[in-house]
Structures are given as structure tokens and as C-alpha cells.
């Protein structure tokens, strides 16, 4: 159903925002390579209602970015309603008079800050905070994984938080599908590699296929960051990243090393010699012993020995929060068939259709409510007409008036959320902005780097032992290198 939207335009970080005129700008929030975000107030709401409006930039400049946007739109719709995943309220796509696209706008749940800002602020956090945050991350992951989706870019900057410690996972642009069948799983080609500091070692080491364990590793890195106040593995490049992991976890056993898909990387690790493991209690002497036990299992080098999300939720460290009845799974698997589409015009039409479908999806309950309202009005009018025909004209019409007065109350609906547990909070105001200490951005994959013309002039030369890439590039691209 096509609905007319009256828009107005204002500036956000010197870029035009053309949005529904009922939304009034509050302030600029942030901007990056893929979008610009502001907060806005919905002027027609009975209560103060604010949202985050994100303008996705450069959506149709590259196939890679278009597919990333389409992926995020579909996933936010699929996961809509889970308490630990950011909620997409609405979306809009604005066209120029000539039919070209002006911008894609997402109207999302407004959260007060992200976890990177909280950690960077240095405000005192307690073990109760760590338990609550870790539990909420795992609840969100359980729901995501149950739909056969891997997030692939969990990091503090992608965890949105409110002052009451409510946490929500965001940014699904790098997500990908997962199958227990290795053959099917290998077909989910990735377009990006995840952020280096939180990237599981099996991705760098070219293990045979990704598993859900990669997100558990990232969550473990975040737990370590809670305990230490800084990233546990802060590599300046991918070789240094591997070195930092080995310096803490020690040299993996031979059975694990044999599963590394690159002989070049195997040789490098052997050349380092034996590296002893550093007990986590040495790194975090003041931490809860149960937190360290959970961390030990989340940061197992071998993904086959790493704790699962379900097991982690049952760990004693999280027992104060664990409630199986309040840890739902997604009712449907996510469909990744759109990933095989590579024609830009086809992808553009899919984005437009997704926006139209979502707008109808979120408006359907309102349309049904309006239909019920009209039906009730018609029934009331019919009843009043019948009463007037049956009763003398001088009969008091107080009952009808009372019915009309009560009518709005009968139709009133509550959008309130159950109150959160009040025990502790965080300071979410005047936090530091993202700076040079922010994790490096995920890099584009080799699939995108490959020349579209088939010209190999820009492909890096092979080195002496016949490998296509040097050690740094092998670790950076991991499994993607075999598709180059």
C-alpha cells in the first residue's frame, strides 16, 4: 500500500535529511563510512517519543554496500521484537523528481550510548554490571544463532546501552548464514572480514568453515574488556594480533595446529617455539573466579572446545540472571538466498521492495485497529438508531453520550514496557566520543578486490613458496583467500 508522506529537510553533519515532517531534529549523534545518525522527536505522540534516524549513505555506489544494506534491513525485520536486539521501527526511501534515489532512512530505537563509550569513560563498573551485560549479549546471540545467522562483528561499539543497563546488539551488515552441513556452509561466501581485535583465530587461520563459535569468541573478548578496562588482544596488524593471542593462550596443541588451512601460517607458529599459557587470574587478579572460568571457556583457541552460547547461559557466573523461560529462540530460519544476486539494478529493486514490504508489515496492526474502530463506530450508530426508533424522542440520551465519552478509553492501547529490574545503572551522559582508540574498521574482502574485468595486473605477486599472499594478508583474509 503506497502512502503519501509529507517530508521536511534539515541538515545533519552538513548533509540533507529528508524525513517525515512529524519528526523534529533533537541533535546529531554520529557519522561514519556507511551512514549518518541523529536523534529526533515524534511531534504527534501523546508522550515524549524519540527515535534514532539513520541515513544510509552510498547505498547504491557499490554492489557490496547495496547488499550489505539489504542484508541489514532483512535481518532487522527478522529479529524485530527481541529485547536484546535493536528494534527497527520504520524505514523510508526518498526519491528525486527524476526517479533516482535520494536516500535510505531507518527509524530505529534510540539508545543512550554504546559499550565502547562506557568502557572508555572509565566509570566504575561492578561485577553485577559484567554479569548483566554478558548475559544480555548471550541472550541476543542465542536468538540470532537459532535463526542460523552469525553476527560476525560483535564488539563494544555494536552494543547499545541505556542508563538502566539495558543492552541491545546492533549492526548486522556483516552477518552471514550458517549451516551444520560443511558443503552448504561453504556456499555462504563472506564479503567482509570482521573487526580485527574481536576476530576469532579460526577465521585468520583458515580453518575449514566458520561456526557459531566465532561469535562466542568475540563475546569472550568483550567480557575480558569488562574485566580489564581495555581490549585483551589489541593487534596493530594481523600478525601482531595472532602473536598477542598466542602470548596469552599459549601454543595450541598439535591436533589444533594441524587443522590450520595455511601451511605458511603453520610454519610461522612452529618458528615461534613453545609459548606457555598465561593464567587469566594473572591478567585480572581482582576478577570473580567464576567470571574467569567462563572467560577461559569462551576464549578457547580451538573452536571445537569453545563453550556454546547455550552452555554459557547455564554457567554459574550468570545464574543470577539465567531463566530458560525468558531466553527465546527465533521461530524461523533466516533466508539468505538474496546473497546470490550480484546485479546492481536487481539489488536496488530488492531494497526498494524490502522498504515497501516493511512499511506494510509495521502498519498492518494499525490498519487492522482502524478497521476495528470503524466497525465499532458503525455498530454503535446502528444501536443508537434502533434505540431512537424504539424510545420516545424526549428520553434522556445520557447513555449514548456516556458511550461516546467512554469510547476513546475503550480503544486506548498501552505501549508501555514492563519495568526493568532496578538495582544498578550506568552514567550515559557526556561520554567520550569514538577516537583513535576505536577498533579498526572491518576490511573489504578479496571478493570485492578482484578486478571485475578479469585483468590480473592488480593482483599481488606470488612469493617464493608459491602462496598468493604474504603472512599478513593470509591472516587478514583467512578463508576468503581460497575464493580469490
Curated annotation (Swiss-Prot):
Positions of post-translational Phosphothreonine modification: 190
Post-translational modification Phosphotyrosine, affected residues: 192
Posttranslational mods: Dually phosphorylated on Thr-190 and Tyr-192, which activates the enzyme.
Reactions this protein catalyses: L-seryl-[protein] + ATP = O-phospho-L-seryl-[protein] + ADP + H(+); L-threonyl-[protein] + ATP = O-phospho-L-threonyl-[protein] + ADP + H(+)
Top-rank lineage group of the source organism: Eukaryota
Enzyme Commission number, as recorded: 2.7.11.24
MF terms in GO: ATP binding; MAP kinase activity; protein kinase activity; protein serine kinase activity; protein serine/threonine kinase activity
KW Amino-acid biosynthesis (keyword) present: no
Protein kinase domain ranges (all copies): 23-318
UniProt keyword annotations, A-Z: ATP-binding, Kinase, Nucleotide-binding, Phosphoprotein, Serine/threonine-protein kinase, Transferase
Cellular component aspect of the GO annotation: cellular bud neck; cellular bud tip; cytoplasm; cytosol; mating projection tip; mitochondrion; nucleus
InterPro entries given in the database record: Kinase-like_dom_sf, MAP_kinase, MAP_kinase_CS, Prot_kinase_dom, Protein_kinase_ATP_BS, Ser/Thr_kinase_AS
Cofactor(s) needed by this chain: Mg(2+)
Positions of region (Disordered): 383-403, 426-464
Motif (TXY): 190-192
Recorded family membership: Belongs to the protein kinase superfamily. CMGC Ser/Thr protein kinase family. MAP kinase subfamily.
Note: Present with 3230 molecules/cell in log phase SD medium.
Domain comment quoted from the record: The TXY motif contains the threonine and tyrosine residues whose phosphorylation activates the MAP kinases.
Subunit structure: Interacts with RLM1.
Role summary: Serine/threonine protein kinase involved in a signal transduction pathway that plays a role in yeast cell morphogenesis and cell growth. This pathway seems to start by SMP3; then involve the kinase PKC1 that may act the BCK1 kinase that then phosphorylates MKK1 and MKK2 which themselves phosphorylate the SLT2/MPK1 kinase which itself then phosphorylates and activates the transcription factor RLM1. Directly phosphorylates BCY1 upon TOR complex 1 (TORC1) inhibition.
Name the record gives this protein: Mitogen-activated protein kinase SLT2/MPK1
UniProt source species: Saccharomyces cerevisiae (strain ATCC 204508 / S288c)
